[in-house]
């Protein structure tokens, strides 16, 4: 299916003078896909700086929003937005993979719209102390919610083969084995505890592509970040949770920035709309027709306009897919996308340098 690039005029919807880091990607296209044309409840599963949430609230005076974020800093930062919209916004700290449970805790059984913006936020990247950036020195952390093992724990504690798999499958780093080997050799001398240490180490192994603006450490940092936060597993859980809470006619819009994220979303919508067979984890190996729980809103990925990528280069890899919930019951979770979100078994490793 051909990809659809948003028209150049879409950027006219952005607030005048807005900073790129505060403007959600594909905002006009997300709002069009959701079609907020009636009173109802919207769930923003990835609140961040509140860009999508504000737009949802401004779409209509009878739209209510529950906004979720696992990052307590983001939740604290949304207090002014809560006050500005007079009781129409509720902020909830938690993981969007549990959004059905989280909105039930808010005495809401179903939602009319769900939007998910997958991956790290610009705010997190820009704050050196969060440990996401290879361009600024800071502690090697990368935890979105502050809980669980940090990137430093993985880098200094995991076996070389596991590190290589993380870098290759989650970061798509072709020189994953060489990078993993260099990490293990370096940590024998001293622990790797800062982003600058790791970025310099990777840059010594991965040569920059001629003429490319991409830093040599980009893919390695991405792979570690995805592993630290279980981002792909969270995406799978979030898709299934959204499927459970959406009313018939409700819409789900998902923005991704990584090819594996997009593949998971594509397979989910393809299976749930009847375009592909569905395999359930409850009946492994059996593919059979299942109720069509979604119909496609976007026939292929919607890409940002050239104007948007000019203003916000971080948007260049973004893709939007959306679907509308049918009245069919939610089928069991899809085993195929759960597999995509996991590291392969050791014997599944392909040849890498």
Swiss-Prot record:
The keyword Cytoplasm is assigned to this record: yes
GO MF annotations, alphabetized: rRNA (cytosine-N4-)-methyltransferase activity
Subcellular location: Cytoplasm
Keyword terms of this UniProt record: Cytoplasm, Methyltransferase, rRNA processing, S-adenosyl-L-methionine, Transferase
Catalytic activity: cytidine(1402) in 16S rRNA + S-adenosyl-L-methionine = N(4)-methylcytidine(1402) in 16S rRNA + S-adenosyl-L-homocysteine + H(+)
EC number annotated for this UniProt entry: 2.1.1.199
Cysteine pairings via disulfide bonds: none
Residues holding S-adenosyl-L-methionine: 50-52, 69, 96, 117, 124
Stretch list, region Disordered: 276-353
Pfam families (alphabetical): Methyltransf_5 (PF01795)
Any one Gene Ontology cellular component term annotated for this protein: cytoplasm
UniProt superkingdom: Bacteria
Transmembrane annotation, as ranges: none
Function according to Swiss-Prot or TrEMBL: Specifically methylates the N4 position of cytidine in position 1402 (C1402) of 16S rRNA.
Entry protein name: Ribosomal RNA small subunit methyltransferase H
Source organism per UniProt: Methylorubrum extorquens (strain CM4 / NCIMB 13688)
């Amino acid at each position: 299916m051909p990809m659809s690039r948003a028209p150049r005029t879409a950027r006219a919807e952005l607030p005048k003078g807005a900073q790129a880091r505060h403007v959600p990607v594909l905002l006009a296209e997300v709002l069009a896909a959701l079609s907020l044309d009636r009173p109802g409840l919207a769930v923003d599963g990835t609140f961040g700086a509140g860009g999508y949430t504000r737009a949802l609230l401004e779409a209509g005076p009878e739209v209510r929003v529950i906004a979720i974020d696992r990052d307590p800093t983001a939740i604290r930062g949304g207090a002014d937005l809560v006050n500005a919209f007079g009781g129409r916004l509720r902020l909830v700290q938690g993981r969007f993979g549990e959004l059905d449970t989280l909105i039930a805790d808010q005495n809401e059984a179903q939602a009319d719209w769900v939007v998910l913006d997958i991956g790290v936020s610009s705010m997190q990247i820009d704050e050196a102390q969060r440990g996401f950036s290879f361009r600024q020195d800071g502690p090697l952390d990368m935890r979105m919610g502050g809980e669980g093992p940090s990137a430093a724990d993985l880098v200094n504690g995991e076996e070389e083969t596991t590190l290589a798999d993380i870098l290759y499958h989650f970061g798509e780093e072709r020189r994953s084995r060489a990078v993993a080997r260099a990490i293990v050799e370096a940590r024998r001398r001293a622990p790797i505890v800062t982003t600058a240490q790791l970025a310099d180490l990777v840059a010594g192994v991965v040569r920059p592509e001629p003429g490319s603006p991409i830093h040599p450490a980009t893919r390695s940092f991405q792979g570690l970040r995805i592993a630290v936060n279980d981002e792909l597993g969270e995406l799978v859980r979030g898709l299934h949770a959204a499927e459970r809470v959406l009313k018939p006619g409700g819409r789900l819009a998902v923005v991704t920035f990584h090819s594996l994220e997009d593949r998971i979303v594509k397979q989910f919508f393809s299976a749930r709309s009847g375009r592909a067979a569905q395999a359930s984890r409850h009946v492994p190996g059996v593919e059979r027709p299942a109720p069509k729980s979604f119909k496609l809103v976007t026939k292929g990925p919607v890409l940002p306009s050239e104007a948007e990528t000019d203003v916000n280069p971080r948007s260049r890899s973004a893709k939007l897919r959306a679907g509308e919930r049918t009245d069919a019951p939610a089928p069991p979770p899809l085993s195929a996308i759960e597999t995509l979100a996991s590291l392969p078994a050791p014997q599944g490793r392909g040849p890498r340098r």
